[in-house]
Swiss-Prot record:
Record field: catalytic activity: nicotinate beta-D-ribonucleotide + ATP + H(+) = deamido-NAD(+) + diphosphate
GO MF annotation terms: ATP binding; nicotinate-nucleotide adenylyltransferase activity
Keyword RNA-binding: no
Name of the protein this chain belongs to: Probable nicotinate-nucleotide adenylyltransferase
First and last residue of the signal peptide: none
InterPro entries: Cyt_trans-like, NadD/NMNAT, Rossmann-like_a/b/a_fold
BP GO terms, sorted: NAD biosynthetic process
Source organism per UniProt: Campylobacter fetus subsp. fetus (strain 82-40)
Keyword Nucleotide-binding appears in the UniProt entry: yes
Protein family according to the UniProt entry: Belongs to the NadD family.
Top EC class for this record: transferase
Length: 181
């Protein structure tokens, strides 16, 4: 069995996240894609939408796709969870032959700062989703995603044109109410 893990804040989920999910299902030889909304990104101190709201958005977008599992694992920990901990958790459950860990190209600059990175890189095959013309080393597998958007831009500019229709109304309502406070 081969699994892929795609963790993120999904604050909010947008078309690039959706493209990554669909590209992973199409291009990776996997039996399961585990999407993990974080409780809190280990490199951040706060979130815009609470974890349960982000989980609901992820479920609305992807839970009905074949081979996809939306995991509550990190949210249930009520703390920032390093990727290594999530990888070990799912290795214990599924005993996979291969674990792909999907990251955005913007994470490459911080990758060696990740908790126990040297251990993590022995356990997973990194798959990097292209972003903003960031060069991806040739030794890493690449997912070609040509959607230029970030969750930060959506939140800060209330620019919802790249939010998938399945969650658009709820995302707009949430962030407009949050910014009105």
């Amino acid at each position: 069995m081969n699994i892929a893990i795609f963790g993120g804040s999904f604050d909010p989920p947008h078309n690039a996240h959706d493209a990554i999910v669909k590209a992973a299902l199409l291009n990776l030889k996997i039996d399961k894609l585990i999407i993990i909304p974080t409780y809190l990104n280990p490199f951040k101190t706060e979130f815009g939408a609470d974890p349960k709201k982000r989980l609901v958005w992820c479920e609305a977008l992807w839970q009905n796709l074949d081979k996809v599992e939306i995991s509550k694992f990190e949210i249930e920990q009520n703390r920032a969870v390093p990727s290594l901990e999530s990888v070990l958790h799912f290795k214990k459950i599924y005993n996979p032959d291969i674990v792909y860990l999907i990251i955005g190209a913007d994470q490459l600059i911080n990758l060696e700062k990740w908790y126990k990175f040297k251990v993590l890189k022995k356990l997973v095959n990194f798959v990097v989703a292209s972003r903003d013309d960031i060069e991806i080393p040739s030794n890493l597998q690449k997912l070609n995603i040509n959607v230029k958007i970030s969750s930060t831009k959506v939140r800060n500019e209330l620019d919802f044109c790249q939010v998938p229709k399945a969650v658009l109304e709820d995302v707009i309502k949430f962030y407009k109410e949050k910014n009105a406070r």
